[in-house]
């Protein structure tokens, strides 16, 4: 299995600044009475810290114990607190049905095979209340041709899914969504907006309808 602990031990705080949309989302969440937020794939805590500072009750969930240790250190240094859990996103989340008002997941859920991505989305739906928000970012449209032969040496394992054979994320699946695919996998949500961010990821803001 991919070794996220190894990546975080080598690179430490891989991301520090929050995603550009998070500040705007925090305002939206406050306006609509969002209180509990799940940061799925929270990594070293950049959104845990920001959203906690904004006054939300935030839970972080990640598969890397090293990342969670760094996240807790960050929170302690900022004199903040958040609930964190270690686990794999394709397995049942440690939260009851309808527990969260919102789920954010930045550059995370695409790191899997499609059957596991669908399992993750089912769990997101389960722990999110009806009327709750999701904000998800994923790569889309497929890798550029040069990515197939550069230092990543991508190998296609199923439709839309590639695994780097070398480089820092060697062995980690990367699923590239199409817009139609995103609409289908989030069919139980009303999509409010879709746009491309400055890292060339597709951002999906949606509300759970069913």
For the regions a language model picked out, list residue spans one by one.
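A short glycine-rich, Lys/Arg-flanked "PGG" loop and its adjoining helix->strand segment in the class I
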Residues: 118-130
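Class I SAM-dependent methyltransferase core
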Residues: 39
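Class I (Rossmann-like) S-adenosyl-L-methionine-dependent methyltransferase catalytic domain
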Residues: 1-34, 43-92, 119, 133-210
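Conserved catalytic-core motifs of eukaryotic protein kinase domains, centered on the activation segment
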Residues: 114-116
């Amino acid at each position: 299995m991919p070794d996220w602990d190894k990546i975080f031990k080598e690179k430490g705080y891989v991301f520090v600044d929050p995603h550009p949309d998070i500040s705007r989302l925090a305002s939206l969440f406050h306006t609509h009475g969002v209180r509990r937020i799940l940061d799925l794939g929270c990594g070293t805590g950049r959104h845990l810290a920001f959203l906690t500072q904004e006054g939300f009750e935030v839970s972080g969930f990640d598969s890397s114990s090293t990342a969670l240790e760094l996240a807790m250190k960050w929170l302690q240094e900022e004199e903040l607190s958040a609930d964190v859990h270690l686990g794999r996103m394709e397995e049942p989340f440690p939260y009851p049905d309808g527990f969260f008002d919102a789920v954010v997941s930045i550059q995370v859920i695409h790191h899997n095979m499609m059957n596991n991505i669908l399992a993750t989305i089912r769990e997101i739906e389960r722990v999110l209340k009806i009327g709750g928000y999701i904000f998800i970012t994923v790569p889309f449209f497929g890798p550029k041709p040069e990515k197939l032969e550069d230092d990543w040496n991508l190998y296609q394992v199923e439709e839309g899914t590639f695994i780097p054979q070398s480089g820092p994320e060697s062995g980690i699946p990367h699923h590239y969504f199409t817009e139609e695919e995103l609409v289908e996998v989030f069919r139980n949500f009303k999509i409010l907006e879709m746009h491309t961010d400055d890292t060339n990821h597709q951002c999906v803001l949606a509300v759970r309808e069913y």
